[in-house]
Curated annotation (Swiss-Prot):
This is Intermediate capsid protein VP6. Its main location: virion. The VP6 trimer contains a zinc ion located at the center of the molecule. The zinc ion is not essential for either trimerization or transcription activity of the DLP. Zinc-depleted VP6 has an increased sensitivity to proteases. Keywords: Calcium, Capsid protein, Intermediate capsid protein, Metal-binding, Ubl conjugation, Virion, Zinc. GO terms for biological process: fusion of virus membrane with host plasma membrane. GO terms for cellular component: viral envelope; viral intermediate capsid. Intermediate capsid protein that self assembles to form an icosahedral capsid with a T=13 symmetry, which consists of 230 trimers of VP6, with channels at each of its five-fold vertices. This capsid constitutes the middle concentric layer of the viral mature particle. The innermost VP2 capsid and the intermediate VP6 capsid remain intact following cell entry to protect the dsRNA from degradation and to prevent unfavorable antiviral responses in the host cell during all the replication cycle of the virus. It comes from the Viruses. It comes from Rotavirus A (strain RVA/Turkey/Ireland/Ty-1/1978/G7P[17]).
Length: 397
């Protein structure tokens, strides 16, 4: 994989720098690097494809090295160089695609395509440019079973989950109390509601709690916490728990009280925040526990009192909510996030070439299903194919 990255980096730089009119001395270093690539691969043959609808392609290498000149690069020089560079770029692209569409239950971090396995041969180790890519560094570490670390912006660590639970429900469904939530990607919205507005709760205080397990441990996270849950606090028709009826959710928004957010690791509280909104920091955690209260206003104007009667029917739902967003974090496991298109690249290629469902990934690379069952095998394969996708993205920009 590191050889493939070095090839891509060299070819990307060569394509950008070897242009007509450039003084040769300004590009002599990259020309020599390209010549090293040519000398290393000349005489080799490779084959890519042959899975799903991905066509088989045979690659042969017999190129002359790029020459030197005391003058500026002319059109003929650049045209000859581009012919060589473009062929090599097509080859690297095909190797990346061939790697992205393959998976294995055992040792999924290792190259799975014949072409990438062949590039692991010692003769190609002379190809060396710059292996400082975060993905290459982590791939090498994971390959040696050492700790890795990815910096993530809005990590997609939460599987989609939109549901509710009722702690009180009368048969007519006009007097309910419970919580409703939406978890997805890096964001949690949670709302607690009570038709009675805590009228019969102890001390006129209704308490709510929501626990969200992570699928991986996050470290050094920056988190934002805001009152209200705008996606959840709108009028809606909601099915009953048994699915046999529906009820009208008609929220009236109040501000939550006694808000507490706990970040836990293996069941132990690591970081705890009380009555604090805005930007929070969490050292390391694998679950989040959010608790808050709905307090019935002790004093209400006639207009407000009419919203929350003291006897049935109860036409409205007093509602308090919170929104928590994981803005950034580090993780030892590779995840998709807001900064990188690699999940889209991988999914698109597997769909384009009708790659059959294998033993590791779910159909269509369904991210929610993948996270819900994020095994060691999936982690290894995902790290490998995301690394290949990161290399491919360098040369197709």
């Amino acid at each position: 994989m590191d050889v493939l990255y070095s090839l891509a980096k060299t070819l990307k730089d060569a394509r950008a720098r070897i242009v007509e009119g450039t003084l040769y001395t300004n590009v002599a270093d990259i020309v020599q690097q390209v010549n090293q690539v040519i000398n290393s691969i000349n005489g080799s043959t490779f084959q890519t494809g042959g899975i799903g609808n991905l066509p088989i392609r045979n690659w042969t290498f017999d190129f002359g090295t790029l020459g030197t000149t005391l003058l500026n690069l002319d059109a003929n020089y650049v045209e000859n160089a581009r012919t060589t560079i473009d062929y090599f770029i097509d080859f690297v692209d095909s190797v990346c695609v061939d790697e992205i569409v393959r998976e294995s239950q055992r040792n999924g971090i290792a190259p799975q395509s014949d072409s990438l396995r062949q590039l692991s041969n010692a003769k190609y180790k002379r190809i060396n440019y710059d292996n400082e890519s975060e993905y290459i560094e982590n791939w090498n570490l994971q390959n040696r079973r050492q700790r890795t670390g990815y910096l993530l912006h809005k990590p997609n660590i939460l599987p989609y989950n939109n549901s509710f639970t009722l702690t009180r429900s009368q048969p007519a469904h006009d007097n309910v109390c419970g919580t409703i939530w939406l978890n997805n990607g890096s964001e949690i919205e949670i709302a607690g509601f009570d038709s009675e507005c805590a009228l019969n709760a102890p001390g006129n205080i209704q308490e709510f709690e929501h626990v969200v397990p992570m699928r991986r441990v996050l470290n050094n996270a920056t988190v934002s916490l805001l009152p209200y849950a705008p996606r959840l606090t709108q009028r809606a028709v909601i099915p009953t728990a048994d699915g046999l009826n529906t009820w009208l959710f008609n929220p009236i928004i109040l501000r939550p009280n006694n808000v507490q957010v706990e970040f836990l690791l293996n069941g132990q509280v690591i970081t705890n925040y009380q009555a604090r909104y805005g930007i929070l920091a969490a050292r390391n955690f694998d679950s989040i526990r959010i608790s808050f209260q709905l307090v019935r206003p002790p004093n209400m104007t006639p207009g407000v009192a009419a919203l929350f009667p003291v006897a049935a029917p109860f036409p409205n739902h007093a509602t308090v909510g919170l929104t928590l967003k994981i803005e950034s974090a580090s993780c030892e496991s590779v995840l998709s996030d807001a900064n990188e298109p690699y999940l889209s690249i991988v999914t698109g290629l597997r769909q384009e070439y009708a790659i059959p469902v294998g033993p590791v990934f779910p159909a269509g690379m369904n991210w929610t299903e993948l996270l819900n069952n994020y095994s060691a095998s999936r982690e290894d394969n995902l790290q490998r194919i995301f690394t290949a996708a990161s290399i491919r993205s360098m040369i197709i920009k």
